[in-house]
Amino acid sequence: MNSQKHLFNNKTFLFSSLLFFFFALTANSQKQICKIYFDDGTVLSGTGKIRMDNSIKLKLNENDKGTDYDPLIIDRIELETDGISQVYKYKKEVDGFHKWLKVLIEGKVSLYKYDMSGFNFGTIPGSGFSGMGMASTPVTYYYVARGEDFEVSIITSLGNISKNFKKTASDYFKDCPVLVEKVNAKEFKKDDIFQVVKFYNTKCETENATSVIKAEN
């Protein structure tokens, strides 16, 4: 009886977490002032949002019913919140998942950010298996890519258990020994990922080492 009750509680918790996940995504995809830059050079402006399937729904005016655009024909989008425009690009993780990522730095190594507010991934309490649960703090994932590569890799995360930053960063930036040395000496920690990428793009003696800052956070 206790085991059945325990299983029921786990299922209830998982269902509640998934429901919360859905509403969190919905809340994070409200319509905003949006500008779409297509691969062919076309630019459209209006109000838009990122849909659950990653397409962009854009309304050109109040009378427009809106059109869904395939993310694969879009170079980037700009979403304006509280008068501040942020650039997002559609990328593919090494594990195959696709998502829109906020652009922080573009250069020889580009840095991207993905916020997951209100929920977390980890071990569900009392269940013995991993899944999604509530979180009191937001989780932020940071991704890196070589230049404009479509595929990105997680370099670190904040607010959640992440990869060994020292090992991951040392491997990714192995062509810059001075940076690896700073990471291993803990001069740069995972909280400093912005400075790490900026250092690599501007200080390391590698080809095309330039850095364009798109956002500080």
Regions found by a protein language model. Give the residues of each.
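C-terminal partner/receptor-binding element of secreted or periplasmic proteins
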Residues: 174-217
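Sec-dependent signal peptide cleavage junction
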Residues: 28-45, 51, 193-194, 205-217
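A general boundary/transition motif marking the beginning of the first structured unit of a protein
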Residues: 2-4, 157, 184-188
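Alpha-helix boundary/interfacial micro-motifs
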Residues: 22-23, 28, 57-58, 208-209
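Bacterial Sec-dependent N-terminal signal peptides
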Residues: 1-32
